[in-house]
């Protein structure tokens, strides 16, 4: 579809430009061989050994976790969140969080944008992609809403009613040739039909009745009827063959197959609303418009309608609920009138006018409806767009890692001693967290640590707790001995 290709092509072009900018540094509008100049100190290679943090300090053996602090591993098939008693996110929640994470991962940090001014071109492309996605999503919602409503257009269906006469042949051997007969054909086609798939003629009708002259063919053989059933096979036309050598007057009654069904309004309601034949929803909407125009809705209770004299004559009540209108409309809606065509089946060989044409209005599906449905169901470019998204995320992640390495190298080059000290302090804090060690072993091993004012109070508290603990043990032992 054209709209699908345009939308998919626009998204692919945006993704390609984003990826080309990130990988090669090519700005939109720059020659393919041009590259962005990099500023600042050179970045270190990926996976630099300076980036790793040792698990423990040099000279210390790996400390094991206290047995009381150890937690049993969750059973197989159970996530860490389940082991901790937290609810496991459902698949839609994981999908939404992954989408939010991916959108955040696409944005370059401000520090990188300051280092590389040309990265603003990438941010502009990212903003354009976001606007494009919003426009496509808004259009998809509009199309979904439009598909919920009937989409019909008026077209002209041309009917061809023709007949042929076969005179009797005295020397014919079979019985069919020895008797004169005529054949009536009813066919038709849409005028100016742009669709490639031609619609069958019978698909426009719910029923077809051909009424012949009762005086010629009797009361039991003068009607030819066709009615649609769930198993009906569509056809391009109808044929009726009867014996006879006299001109016959016939009446064709054609009932159109309305989708959605339409009804003929009661004459009083038709005059009130200005409608003759319409669908039920259109009739209810027109009735509500009449109520609003004439201010018939109750000012205190909006659920009720106070009828005027015409309203009361039609619905036979002065006041009713609006929810009762669909039920009361049932008695006021009649089957639509059939199309009536009078035709003369001529058997006169000199009569050249044996084909009659009639144009009738029919409703057909909007051609755009199929294209709109195809647009909603199309996934032709989703895989390519997802692949480009993955490449962009990987490239952004690589850029962030290189930025961390650059900051490490730049800080180390400016103040090697201070940076190493800061790194050791940071790793020392990490070591405490990993080994669950409380306090500061480096300070605790020095005597000055215990000459601070808090030490006297700590000693008093310690001995007090020990005395209380010993007293409780003695009291328990005396109680046991006395019993």
From Swiss-Prot:
Location in or out of the cell: Nucleus
Pfam families (alphabetical): SWIB
Organism, as annotated: Mus musculus
PANTHER family: SWI/SNF-RELATED MATRIX-ASSOCIATED ACTIN-DEPENDENT REGULATOR OF CHROMATIN SUBFAMILY D
Phosphoserine modifications at: 178
Gene Ontology cellular-component annotations: brahma complex; chromatin; nBAF complex; npBAF complex; nucleoplasm; nucleus; SWI/SNF complex
SMART domains noted in UniProt: SWIB (SM00151)
Subunit structure, as described in the record: Component of the multiprotein chromatin-remodeling complexes SWI/SNF: SWI/SNF-A (BAF), SWI/SNF-B (PBAF) and related complexes. The canonical complex contains a catalytic subunit (either SMARCA4/BRG1/BAF190A or SMARCA2/BRM/BAF190B) and at least SMARCE1, ACTL6A/BAF53, SMARCC1/BAF155, SMARCC2/BAF170, and SMARCB1/SNF5/BAF47. Other subunits specific to each of the complexes may also be present permitting several possible combinations developmentally and tissue specific.
GO terms of molecular function: chromatin binding; nuclear receptor binding; signaling receptor binding; transcription coregulator binding
Tissue specificity as recorded in UniProt: Ubiquitously expressed.
Ranges of biased composition (kind: Low complexity): 78-88
Modified residues (N-acetylalanine): 2
PROSITE patterns: SWIB_MDM2
GO biological process: cardiac right ventricle formation; chromatin remodeling; heart morphogenesis; muscle cell differentiation; nervous system development; neural retina development; nucleosome disassembly; positive regulation of cell differentiation
Cited function: Involved in transcriptional activation and repression of select genes by chromatin remodeling (alteration of DNA-nucleosome topology). Component of SWI/SNF chromatin remodeling complexes that carry out key enzymatic activities, changing chromatin structure by altering DNA-histone contacts within a nucleosome in an ATP-dependent manner. Stimulates nuclear receptor mediated transcription. Belongs to the neural progenitors-specific chromatin remodeling complex (npBAF complex) and the neuron-specific chromatin remodeling complex (nBAF complex).
Location of region: Disordered: 27-102
Major location category of this protein: nucleus
Family: Belongs to the SMARCD family.
Gene field: Smarcd3
Protein name: SWI/SNF-related matrix-associated actin-dependent regulator of chromatin subfamily D member 3
SWIB/MDM2 domain mapped to chain residues: 258-335
Keywords attached to this entry: Acetylation, Chromatin regulator, Neurogenesis, Nucleus, Phosphoprotein, Transcription, Transcription regulation
């Amino acid at each position: 579809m054209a709209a699908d290709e345009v939308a998919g092509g626009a998204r692919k072009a945006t993704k390609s430009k984003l990826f080309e900018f990130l990988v090669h540094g090519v700005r939109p509008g720059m020659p393919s061989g041009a590259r962005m100049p990099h500023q600042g100190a050179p970045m270190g290679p990926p996976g630099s050994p300076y980036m790793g943090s040792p698990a423990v300090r040099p000279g210390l053996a790996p400390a094991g976790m206290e047995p009381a602090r150890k937690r049993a591993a969750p059973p197989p098939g159970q996530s860490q969140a389940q082991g901790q008693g937290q609810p496991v996110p459902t698949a839609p929640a994981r999908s939404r969080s992954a989408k939010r994470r991916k959108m955040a991962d696409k944005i370059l940090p401000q520090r990188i944008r300051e280092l590389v001014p040309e990265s603003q071109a990438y941010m502009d492309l990212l903003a354009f992609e976001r606007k494009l996605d919003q426009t496509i999503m808004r259009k998809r919602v509009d199309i979904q809403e439009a598909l919920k409503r009937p989409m019909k257009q008026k077209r002209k269906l041309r009917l061809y009613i023709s007949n042929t006469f076969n005179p009797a042949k005295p020397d014919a051997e079979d019985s069919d040739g020895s008797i004169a007969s005529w054949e009536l054909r009813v066919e038709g086609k849409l005028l100016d039909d742009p669709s490639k798939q031609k619609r069958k003629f019978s698909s426009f009708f719910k029923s077809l009745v051909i009424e012949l002259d009762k005086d010629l063919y009797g009361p039991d053989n003068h009607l030819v009827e066709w009615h649609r059933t769930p198993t009906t096979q569509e056809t391009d036309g109808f044929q009726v063959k009867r014996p006879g050598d006299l001109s016959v007057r016939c009446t064709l009654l054609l009932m159109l197959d309305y989708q959605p069904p339409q009804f003929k309004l009661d004459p009083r309601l038709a005059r009130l609303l200005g409608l003759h034949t319409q669908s039920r929803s259109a009739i209810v909407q027109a009735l509500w418009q009449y109520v609003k125009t004439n201010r018939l809705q109750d000012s205190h209770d909006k659920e009720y309608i106070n009828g005027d004299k015409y309203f009361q004559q039609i619905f036979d009540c002065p006041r009713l609920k609006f929810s009762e209108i669909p039920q009361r409309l049932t008695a006021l809606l009649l089957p639509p009138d059939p199309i009536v065509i009078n035709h003369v089946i001529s058997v006169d060989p000199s009569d050249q006018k044996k084909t009659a044409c009639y144009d009738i209005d029919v409703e057909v599906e909007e051609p755009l409806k199929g294209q709109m449905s195809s647009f909603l169901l199309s996934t032709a470019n989703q895989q390519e767009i997802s692949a480009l998204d993955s490449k962009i995320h990987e490239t952004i992640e690589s850029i962030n890692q290189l930025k961390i390495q650059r900051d490490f190298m730049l800080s180390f080059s400016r103040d090697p001693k201070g940076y190493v000290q800061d790194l050791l302090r940071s790793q020392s804090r990490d070591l405490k967290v990993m080994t669950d060690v409380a306090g500061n072993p480096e300070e605790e091993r020095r005597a000055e640590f215990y000459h601070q004012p808090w030490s006297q109070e700590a000693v008093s508290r310690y001995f007090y707790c020990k005395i209380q603990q010993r007293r409780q043990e003695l009291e328990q032992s005396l109680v046991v001995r006395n019993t």
